[in-house]
């Protein structure tokens, strides 16, 4: 049975952190807008935003070495690191505003202070990290970062990583107490709870079948109720596709020119999770290493303290897996169905160019549990097999697109696609993703609500005081804002 519903102002597809953030921003900036949300699963934040489906790192380049690039002359380019840190500052300011205004309570349910650290082995890598820290510390955003090669100091930070270490190779660690662990699933659920209280229609177990533009300029979105099997068509002035790995297939259904010559490559993640509480309680940090030469950015190994429902956990990974699914709950046909006449050359070109990625994935798929444990022992020399179990994390779909220079380029990062008229936006890609959700959604609003955005700026600056500024260039403003953020989020 198919029914036609009346028009709405905004449709958000996907019940993750991106839709939750965009919906919250719109209700703050334009409360009269009628918003509907459609999610395929039974509750919000259960795919990419789920606490076990991502690393929970508040990505701010305090520990992620792949956000800084080393030149042939030994200089380190920190521009990407500064940008990502600035984006995370925006997220923290918005969350602090929501706590301050009573829309989020008990911030420790979704954010915890956890030191962020980098770890390297070998003379060349030690030289790199020294140069990296020296360059980063020129910015106020990284003023609290410490570097050490002193065994006792390093042991005081991460005893498990120093005890039992026998190699003569030099090691170095950085330490920044301002790092965080974020439960994006808990945050997403709370944001949607607030939106429901503000009149937003959030419907679960809803599968979006089609998205088509009308001559009037509005969009028709066909949705199937997975419980009743009824199909309903909704009309909306604006559509946002924030459905994780399912965003690409949904974008392709729109037929907009920006959906052409773009593809996706799914990668799944495996982690080792510690089952020994005594071990878990002796490590309190997110420690990121350096990816092997030739390995993709997604392969950066890290030993992570996590907080889930108030309980501390310890994970190590990721190890790449392969599944043709675009979502953890998706179909094995997702990858095949995403190949279209307009992107087949794009996909094939990427396959030819990215042989190193293919080799990496094959090598990861061949790993035994003992080999995974050997990788862990690079970080934690005394790790015991019996204390760790393998868990499967979420699916990520890496974007493949044509650029002006060449076809089939694999993109690492998060990408916003918008129609020419700004009536539709889609979010594709992976890390840093959720950490930068607020800044990304500001980008969506600027591109899709061009006429209204200028009038919204005073309210935006109330919610995010640094909006329009680069905090790295305004030390006093950073300290003033950070004091407020620390007060409300209860982090450092």
Curated annotation (Swiss-Prot):
Cofactor(s) needed by this chain: FAD
Record-level GO BP terms: tricarboxylic acid cycle
Enzyme type, top EC level: oxidoreductase
Record's catalysed reaction(s): (S)-malate + a quinone = a quinol + oxaloacetate
InterPro entries in the cross-refs: FAD/NAD-bd_sf, MQO
Pathway recorded for this protein: Carbohydrate metabolism; tricarboxylic acid cycle; oxaloacetate from (S)-malate (quinone route): step 1/1
UniProt GO molecular function: 2-hydroxyglutarate dehydrogenase activity; L-malate dehydrogenase (quinone) activity
EC numbers for this chain: 1.1.5.4
Keyword annotations from UniProtKB, A to Z: FAD, Flavoprotein, Oxidoreductase, Tricarboxylic acid cycle
SUPFAM superfamilies according to UniProt: FAD/NAD(P)-binding domain (SSF51905)
Family: Belongs to the MQO family.
Protein name as annotated: Probable malate:quinone oxidoreductase 1
């Amino acid at each position: 049975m198919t029914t036609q519903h009346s028009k709405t102002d905004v449709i958000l597809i996907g019940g993750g952190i991106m839709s939750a953030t965009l919906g919250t921003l719109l209700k703050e900036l334009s409360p009269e807008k009628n918003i509907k949300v459609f999610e395929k699963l039974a509750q919000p934040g259960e795919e990419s935003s789920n606490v076990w489906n991502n690393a929970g790192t508040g990505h701010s380049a305090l520990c992620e070495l792949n956000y800084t690039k080393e030149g042939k002359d030994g200089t380190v380019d920190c521009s990407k690191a500064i940008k990502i840190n600035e984006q995370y500052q925006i997220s923290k300011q918005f969350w602090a505003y929501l706590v301050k205004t009573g829309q989020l309570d008990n911030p420790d349910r979704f954010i915890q202070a956890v030191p962020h650290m980098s770890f390297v082995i070998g003379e060349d890598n030690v030289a790199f990290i020294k140069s990296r820290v020296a360059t980063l510390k020129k910015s106020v955003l990284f003023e609290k970062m410490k570097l050490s090669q002193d065994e006792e100091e390093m042991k005081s930070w991460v005893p498990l990583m120093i005890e039992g270490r026998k190699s003569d190779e030099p090691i170095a660690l950085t330490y920044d107490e301002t790092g965080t662990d974020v439960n994006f699933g808990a945050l997403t659920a709370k944001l949607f709870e607030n939106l429901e209280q503000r009149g937003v229609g959030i419907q679960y177990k809803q599968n979006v079948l089609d998205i088509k533009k009308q001559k009037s300029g509005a969009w028709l979105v066909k949705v199937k109720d997975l419980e009743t099997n009824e199909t309903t068509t909704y009309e909306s002035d604006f559509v946002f596709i924030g459905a994780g790995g399912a965003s690409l297939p949904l974008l392709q259904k729109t037929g907009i020119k920006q959906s052409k010559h773009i593809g996706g490559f799914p990668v799944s993640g495996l982690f080792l999770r510690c089952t020994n509480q005594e071990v878990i309680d002796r490590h309190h940090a997110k420690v990121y290493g350096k990816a092997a030469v030739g390995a993709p950015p997604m392969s950066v190994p890290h030993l992570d303290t996590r907080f889930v429902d108030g309980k501390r956990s310890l994970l190590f990974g990721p190890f790449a897996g392969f599944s043709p699914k675009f979502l953890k709950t998706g179909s094995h046909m997702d990858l095949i169905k995403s190949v279209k006449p307009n992107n087949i050359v794009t996909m094939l070109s990427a396959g030819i160019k990215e042989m190193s990625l293919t080799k990496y994935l094959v090598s990861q798929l061949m790993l035994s549990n003992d080999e995974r444990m050997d990788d862990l022992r690079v970080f934690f020399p005394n790790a015991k097999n019996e204390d760790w179990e393998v868990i499967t994390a979420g699916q990520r779909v890496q974007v493949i697109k044509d650029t002006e220079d060449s076809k089939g380029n694999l993109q690492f990062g998060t990408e916003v696609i918008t129609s020419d008229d700004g009536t539709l936006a889609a979010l594709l890609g992976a890390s840093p993703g959720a950490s930068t959700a607020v800044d990304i959604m500001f980008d969506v609003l600027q591109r899709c609500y061009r006429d209204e955005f200028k009038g919204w700026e005073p309210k935006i600056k109330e919610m995010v005081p640094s909006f329009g500024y680069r905090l790295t260039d305004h030390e006093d403003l950073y300290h003033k804002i950070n004091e407020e953020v620390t007060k409300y989020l209860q982090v450092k």
